[in-house]
Amino acid sequence: MTRTGLPALALTALACGAPAGDEATRTAAGGAGGAATAPADRVALFGDMHIHTMYSHDAFMGTVRTTPDDAYRFARGEAIPHPSGESIRLSGAPLDFLAVTDHAEYLGALPALIDPDSPTYGHPLTEDLFSGEGGAARARLGALSRLRELAATGDPINGPEVRASAWQRIIEAAERHNDPGRFTALIGYEYTKGVGGRHVHRNVIFRGGEAPELPFSSLDGDPEDLWNWLDGLREAGIEALAMPHNMNQSDGLAFPDRETWKGAEIDAEFAAKRIRNEPVAEISQQKGTSEVHPSLSPNDEWADFQIVQYYLDRVNNTDPISIFKGGYWRDALLTGLEMEERLGVNPYALGAVGSSDSHVSAGSYEEDNRFSSRTNTPQARGSAYREEDGGWENFWTPRTATHGTGGLAGVWADTNTRAAIFDALTRRESFATSGTRIRVRFFGGFGLEDAIAGAADQVAAAYEHGVPMGGDLSASESRTLGAPASSPASGNAAAPSFLVWALRDPENAWLQRAQVVKGWLEDGEAKEQVYDVVCSDGLPDPETHRCDDNGAQVNLDDCSISRDKGAVELRTTWTDPDFDPGARSFYYVRVLENPTCRWSTWDALSLGIEPNPDLHATHQERAWSSPIWYTP
């Protein structure tokens, strides 16, 4: 997210001509206030559910010494120390909620080595990690390999006493900072399963203040074993969910369509277990966006956004990632339709969230205020060449330079509490952003356009006559409602209509367009199409379903942006012109801002040099809704 330097506008001013009591007024309350008395009174909350502190072994090896308490303080707007020695702080508004998600694997093992009260204080591995020689990256990685070997032998370095102590401290920090109605501190952790550098990671989030004595880690079993564990917790009265992330680095292992991790054939039971425990996926974070890949969706002009090209967990491996199918959210949504046709259950009916995956106890969401995980210089992160390079032609761009800023999770919740946020996630009334705070609403229904026309409160009418993002529509509803809308592709068959609504982040760029991304099955084959449904300056072309370029510009001399292009609000009702009542389908909204400078360009500007030619100078920040599904 890039700060434009403009004064923050009251959200009530954003909904041009919006009826009193509707969206604009409703979101002005932010995260404070009492519980919603009706679904239409739900508020948009922004948070991060992927933060690492010193209790994660990789963060600790990166000289991070900040704690969960620091993470919550940062989220609430306070300054905390960065490993570089600098002080870091949000330049915009505080977050509404946060989850510290330290790795369950070797949880707290490294801080315990230098804690005099720990049973592993003075362990032989300590010298390897903290001696002068151990300061080198290779030595630290060697020590990490040794840590894994020791853990496999039952060495107390990864014993239950060490892990339970760290876990308890994480829970206690969440309890200290949880402030219902004002700020929510969720209890969570990361399950970090890797197969040869390929990620099948998950974050686990708990609904309340109850949590098990120890988190379930990848050392305890594969993701299916994790779901069994979550099912067992639920039976014991402890509700939790998992959300996959970094799917873009999984080589297709994130979303298999035929074979489980145990080598068995995927069946309906497996599919049901997965979607029961994993209702949402993290599709935007600093290690890349996992919405879509250009090779999977070549007709999507906006697919090339924060695409990570290299594996992160293979030292000195510069081979690019080459397997994309099974590693991106839209592809999984399409695969889910095919699997539902075959199995009767869709394991990939996934909502969307974003988060940061920060390893310094603080998410970096702002393009002009970005900080790295360890060293915090432009030269180290590839946005500036070193003096000895003499220019870009002699500079090797590190693979991490393609990383972005952190994403954010948005939810429409009854109030700012653990239970309300968790419930929004389970019903998939959630959305993701690339770090900007665009508010997105999305409703679908048969006859919805007529039902909300002229309504005093369109949101209330949309809840009454349709479903919000994350919901399901069926052919039986179409027949019951007798909706009048029709589409050319289906003759007289009723087609669903959708309410698409987005409000600009008042401290970021103006909105350029809102799109509906549709996926469906046609003769058993998955298809997709992107429709521009509302433009900031003009109307979509009815033939191409595209908005004209609105002409918004970025001045690379100072990163200033066009002030006369774009919209503060985008709102429309849209009816699918190509609806086939016999085809399984899904729809989700993607909202694009006008172009702004990427973080690497801001870095170059601060040093008075040209931006790195190997990186995008500008990009379009965005938001994604969770889908609405249609079942024939």
Describe the residue ranges of each PLM region.
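C-terminal functional module detector
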Residues: 24-68, 72, 82-122, 159, ...
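Bacterial signal peptide processing site
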Residues: 17-20
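Enzymes and membrane/adaptor proteins characterized by extended Gly/Ser/Thr/Asp/Glu-rich
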Residues: 51-61, 125-128, 144-151, 199-214
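The substrate-binding groove and active-site-proximal loops of carbohydrate-active enzymes
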Residues: 57-62, 150-164, 207-220, 318-327
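Long, well-ordered early-domain segments
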Residues: 105, 138-184, 198
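Low-complexity, serine/threonine/proline-enriched polar segments
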Residues: 125-152, 541, 558-559
